[in-house]
């Protein structure tokens, strides 16, 4: 028996490779599937099944392409209604994989079709639970994503409680838990940084599995403090349900080297967005006018999904050398399939062609402190709501302007004003500054090091509130 977790940090997502006697099952594959095929071929094994725990919202799964390339069967739990060929399993249905068995446990709540997959060893002993977004380590999946018709988030939360109590808690303590996500995912509120656990420990430490918790208490607690989902979640879920373009075609389309003239022509004629994915320090030093910064050194794909509202948006890339294919791949993981190419030679090519270059003013926390004390300045704190509430600068002209909702809140800022922008460490503030600049805000200043550096000055702060109490 082979079980491999294939974890993708940028998405905080775990896919799984299971092998027994030459037969392979893949659970929740990523969009690019060649790695799974290569693993199986290396072991002279054949991919037999592709198990999907639900219609994922935070990434585009590779189930459709993997099935086309291997002939493997796609399997969903009860009530799933995909627009492609798949086996819709019954609750408790068992699938044979070599000497192993995989049992479908229908666990509605995160979504109505959500299911866990219980792996039994060759002695038919419960060995591992592939829990999808039903159970994370330290948390459970948010129950607000699949509301429709007369099914409310409270209904879904109630279903989730019953699924956990009737299908998960009843399993033995030594069952290994393999969740679909870890810390950093927006599919839950407080996921552990660990990506593999044991069910007995979760019964002791996970608030959602407390033995003394009533259904009403669970519903209240699991819904408390859930931030609105990123705008791309519903769109990715629909792609996973309806099907999508072949990843190989998407990569071929986007992996095109363009000289400065062709790059500029495409930007103008195709209304393409110029996306600069270099490190923020490089963007600060020089960038193409009206380009947007979202660096691949940070939470790239989720921020793209949160901020670029049209999945069909034509995109042109400015990347670090050698990162072109990786960038196209990471865009496709969240459904952005319309990359038209990249600037060959990067920003140096643009400069050599005599094209216009802009910079972003960036100052130290110490310099910012002097301005804050001696002038009336406008400060934008672009951190998340919980970060801001925990502690922030205390001042009349300090404005919370969360990057997550910058598109919705543009009317809260004035293009005639000068804004000093900070986040926690200096990544998100540059994203926000680039968006504002592209929309005609000519006077934006980044505070290098963000709130982490500002805290080391003597500027006034609000009293710290532990985030766990918010």
Name each model-derived stretch.
Residues 1-46, 117-132, 137-138:
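Conserved beta-strand hairpin/beta-sheet module of binuclear metal-dependent hydrolase folds
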Residues 18, 28, 54, 66, ...:
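Divalent metal-coordination and catalytic microenvironments
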Residues 26-27, 47-56, 74-79, 106-109, ...:
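Active-site neighborhood of phospho(di)ester-bond hydrolases with catalytic His/Asp-centered motifs
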Residues 29-30, 55, 79, 111, ...:
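Active-site metal-binding loops of divalent metal-dependent hydrolases
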Residues 33-75:
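Active-site metal-binding motif and surrounding structural segment of the metallo-beta-lactamase
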Residues 101, 111-229:
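Metallo-beta-lactamase
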Residues 142-144, 150, 201-238, 242, ...:
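Rhodanese-like catalytic fold shared by cysteine-dependent sulfurtransferases
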Residues 179-184, 189-190, 235-237, 277-279, ...:
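Short, well-ordered beta-to-alpha junction loops that form the rim of enzyme active sites
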């Amino acid at each position: 028996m082979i079980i491999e977790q294939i974890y993708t940090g940028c998405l905080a997502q775990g896919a799984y490779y299971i092998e027994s006697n030459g037969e392979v099952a893949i659970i929740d594959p990523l969009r690019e599937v060649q790695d799974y095929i290569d693993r199986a071929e290396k072991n002279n094994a054949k991919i037999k099944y592709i198990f999907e725990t639900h219609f994922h919202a935070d990434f585009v799964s590779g189930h459709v392409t993997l099935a086309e390339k291997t002939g493997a069967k796609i399997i969903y739990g009860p009530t799933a209604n995909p627009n492609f060929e798949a086996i819709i399993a019954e609750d408790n249905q068992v699938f044979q994989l070599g000497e192993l068995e995989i049992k479908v446990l229908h666990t509605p709540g995160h979504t109505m079709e959500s299911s866990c997959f219980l792996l039994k060893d060759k002695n038919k002993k419960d060995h591992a639970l592939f829990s999808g977004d039903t159970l994370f380590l330290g948390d459970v999946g948010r129950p607000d994503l699949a509301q429709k018709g007369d099914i409310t988030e409270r209904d879904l939360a109630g279903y989730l409680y019953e699924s956990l109590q009737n299908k998960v808690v009843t399993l033995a303590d030594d069952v290994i838990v393999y969740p679909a996500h870890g810390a950093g995912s927006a599919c839950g509120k407080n996921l552990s940084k660990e990506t593999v656990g044991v069910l007995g420990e979760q019964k002791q430490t996970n608030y959602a599995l407390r033995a003394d918790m009533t259904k009403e208490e669970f519903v209240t607690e699991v819904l408390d403090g859930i931030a609105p989902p990123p705008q791309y979640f519903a769109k990715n879920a629909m792609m996973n349900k309806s099907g999508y373009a072949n990843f190989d075609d998407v990569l071929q389309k986007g992996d095109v080297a363009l000289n400065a003239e062709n790059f500029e022509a495409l930007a103008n004629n195709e209304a393409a967005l110029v996306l600069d994915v270099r490190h923020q320090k490089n963007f600060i030093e020089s960038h193409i006018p009206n380009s947007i910064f979202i660096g691949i050194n940070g939470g790239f794909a989720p921020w793209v999904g949160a901020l670029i509202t049209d999945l069909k948006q034509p995109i042109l890339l400015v990347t670090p050398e050698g990162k072109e294919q990786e960038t196209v791949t990471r865009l496709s993981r969240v459904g952005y399939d319309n990359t038209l190419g990249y600037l060959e030679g990067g920003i140096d090519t643009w400069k050599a062609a005599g094209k216009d270059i802009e910079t972003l003013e960036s100052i130290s926390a110490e310099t910012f402190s002097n301005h804050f004390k001696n002038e009336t300045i406008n400060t934008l704190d672009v951190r998340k709501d919980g970060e801001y509430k925990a502690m922030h600068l205390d001042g009349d002209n300090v404005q919370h302007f969360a990057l997550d909702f910058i598109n919705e809140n543009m009317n809260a800022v004035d293009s005639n004003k000068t804004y000093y922008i900070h986040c926690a460490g200096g990544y998100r503030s540059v994203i926000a500054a680039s968006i504002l600049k592209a929309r005609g805000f000519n006077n934006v200043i980044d505070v290098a090091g963000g709130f982490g550096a500002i805290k080391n000055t003597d500027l006034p702060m609000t009293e710290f509130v532990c985030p766990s109490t918010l």
